[in-house]
Amino acid sequence: VIYHWLKIKLSEFRLPLQKLNNQTIIKMALEITDQNFEELVMKSDKPVLVDFWAEWCGPCRVVGPVVDELAAEYGDKAVIGKCNVDHNPGIPTQFGIRNIPTLLFFKNGELVDKQVGAAPKSILADKINAHL
């Protein structure tokens, strides 16, 4: 009963679900912080998408679930993360981020693309695919 209730509640949030060893898990974007940015983003050998967002930002709340869906779909092919700009001011300052949501795309430690403002999932997927 609890499983079905949880499944219904999660579907309301459109969180991506995956099966692992016959157990349903939620695959979401990684939390990117000032402390782990270098390791997870700059040293990654995979394409990386980082969504810079804040809790109070309306458009960020639209983009957030899309980023989680991309994390589920790309799995181990790309690193998909989110950075809360209120909790981690260093990275946004380093990259001159003044508007949110801003999504930065990295490959081999280099910034290769940028999306400022909300964008459809297909646009973000195209930008990731260009660097796979």
Give the ranges of each region predicted by the language model.
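Structural microenvironment flanking redox-active thiols in thiol-disulfide oxidoreductases
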Residues: 85-93
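Conserved helix-turn-beta segment immediately C-terminal to the redox Cys motif
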Residues: 45-47, 64-83
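Short pre-active-site segment immediately N-terminal to redox-active cysteine/selenocysteine motifs
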Residues: 45-46, 52-56, 99
